[in-house]
A protein has these predicted regions:
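Generic hydrophobic/aromatic pocket-lining and core-packing "Φ" positions
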Residues: 69, 137, 178, 234, ...
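Residue-level signal for inorganic ion chemistry
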Residues: 53, 72, 106, 123, ...
Length: 537
């Protein structure tokens, strides 16, 4: 194991130096004196402001930091950064055009640009970011290198592990986590990068050595407005790579591969097609758990170099060949996630053998087509986040051996009729191809919070679209009642699929506890998949 060597570090605190890179529209009248003062900490939450802190007023969706400038002044702030100067404020104001951009610029400067001292890998896409980032870290750690993590499940920086509140944290927290990693001697880190995080400048001033766009499908369109706008935000991550960086693209995804000639970085492709530089051949998904041959052809890398301005990477240590892989996580999507992670770590100089061994021992992420029960019948749990996710999950199911399928489906709440219509239309394309025993939809009123309650318009869209098939169903108000119905109908050899986003988060906990009550002698084994679980508690 590589020894972690802690770095020496002193926060940059002189206000003038901190603000040297800002796009400042106006400074306060006393700037010539103020710029030599030392600030204590940067703050974007007025409740945390202390003596000599610099408070940055950010306009959010629910609150505007400009409304709390008086509070920041009372609590001893040295100065504030604002977009809109406030009259009669007893606090020096540094006026900028974009406070969110200023937070990122200030945070990176304050923490002395920690991303430049790491091999930082950024992963974006509609589906699979979490799994791919964890696979990447597992391979890096298998080689004996500590690896920091920032993503949907947790933030791990060497000092602590905390549950995440956002996939991509705000810029101030992000730079602090990256600085902690450097301080703890980490040389590698992997980070999920969301489209919203990119749009809100959370990763501005963050240097990525490599990045991947693993796929793109309809997601967050309520925020971005269109697929084109969504893609524009996602593509920022890869277009921001410098010429020494590596852009990893999905050869089988049209949105991803379209970036091949739009980036300055070197390009590598993964997938199942012959165009992929790292690909899976002889793929078998009959059990649900993939086996395949990992194929890497150095000549294909050279072909990539001819198709793009830059050579992919140093080929001297890479030999042609195929390497058998058996995954412990189900689904076709797991194959793509594994290929993406492998392609990224090959850039670090790791051998294909280490990659194949590490991904074979990966246990998966909760609620990503996760097998939570394997008895007379099996139970899989999937978050059905969007149409691409639904397609991947049901395609994997269609290639598996089972008797019949019992699907418990949580209608998605407060995401609008359009999202629900697209989800049900995707479901309807698959339901005739699956061996359905029962389709059991639920509103999950007993488990969701206010922000995820299914609205009347969403129920109406669901019912309208379900008229297009002949599958009988009853909508259950409560998830627990829907799960009772699933257990009443399931037969040996069947699969129960727990399908849905927030409305199904509690599904595995509820159904496994019901099974444990039926079989108390095996209670511990039945409930084992819930250990360490975050969703649904």
């Amino acid at each position: 194991m590589t020894k972690k060597i802690k770095a020496n570090y002193q926060a940059i605190q002189e206000l003038g130096r901190l603000c040297s890179g800002l796009d400042v529209q106006s400074f306060p009248d006393n700037w010539e004196t103020l710029k030599h003062c030392a600030i204590n900490q940067l703050q974007i939450d007025s409740r945390k402001v202390g003596k000599d802190d610099l408070f940055i007023a950010v306009k959010g969706f629910e609150a505007d930091g400009h409304a709390y400038l008086d509070q920041a002044a009372r609590q001893g702030a040295l100065a504030t950064v604002v977009e809109v100067p406030q009259p009669n404020l007893d606090l020096p104001q540094i006026v900028v055009a974009d406070s969110r951009a200023a937070v990122a610029d200030l945070a990176s400067q304050y923490y002395d640009h920690p991303s430049r001292q790491l091999q930082l890998c950024g992963i974006t896409g509609s589906n699979g970011k979490t799994s791919t980032s964890l696979l990447y870290r597992q391979i890096i750690q298998a080689a004996g290198w500590p690896c920091g993590l920032i993503g949907t499940v947790a933030y791990e920086d060497g000092l602590s592990k905390v549950s995440s509140s956002m996939t991509t944290p705000d810029a101030l927290d992000l730079q602090r986590y990256l600085r902690n990693m450097v301080q703890e001697g980490y040389e590698h880190a992997v980070m999920e990068v969301s489209s919203i995080g990119l749009h809100q400048n959370r990763v501005r001033q963050t240097h990525f050595a490599q990045a991947a766009l693993i796929n793109l499908s309809h997601e967050h369109l309520d925020y971005h407005g269109s697929m084109e706008a969504y893609f524009h935000e996602k593509s920022k991550l890869l277009k921001g790579l410098d010429e020494e960086g590596v852009a990893v693209l999905n050869a089988d995804d049209p949105w991803s591969i379209s970036l091949a000639d739009q980036v300055s970085a070197r390009v590598l492709r993964f997938g199942l097609s012959d165009q992929a530089d790292v690909r899976a051949e002889n793929l078998d998904l009959s059990t649900g758990f993939a086996t395949f041959d990992l194929c890497i052809d150095p000549e294909n890398f050279l072909a990539s170099a001819k198709r793009t301005p830059k050579t992919a990477f140093n080929l001297n240590q890479l030999e042609a060949g195929s390497y058998p892989v058996k995954l412990q996580v189900p689904g076709l999507h797991s194959v793509y996630n594994s290929l993406a992670a492998i392609t990224l770590v090959l850039c670090q100089g790791l051998t294909p053998e280490i990659c194949a061994q590490a991904v074979a021992s990966y246990g998966g992420v909760e609620r990503r087509f996760q097998q939570v029960y394997n008895g007379d019948f099996r139970i899989f749990d999937d978050h059905f986040a969007n149409t691409k996710n639904i397609d991947m999950t049901l395609k994997s199911l269609s290639e598996m051996d089972y008797q019949q399928l019992v699907m418990v489906y949580a209608i998605r709440g407060k995401r609008g009729p359009k999202v629900n219509r697209e989800n049900i239309q995707t479901l309807n394309r698959w339901l005739p191809q699956l061996k359905m025993r029962a389709f059991i939809p639920s509103l999950s009123q007993d488990t969701v919070g206010h922000y995820d309650e299914v609205q009347p318009a969403e129920i109406a869209v669901f019912q309208e679209e379900m008229q297009n098939n002949n599958l009988p169903y009853t909508i259950y108000d409560e998830l627990e009642a829907a799960l009772d119905q699933a257990l009443a109908q399931v037969q040996p050899g069947d699969i129960i699929l727990l399908a849905g986003c927030q409305g199904m988060d509690a599904g595995a906990r509820l159904i496994l506890n019901k099974l444990a009550e039926r079989d108390p002698a095996h209670r511990e084994a039945i409930l084992a998949p819930l250990q360490g679980r975050v969703c649904g508690w």
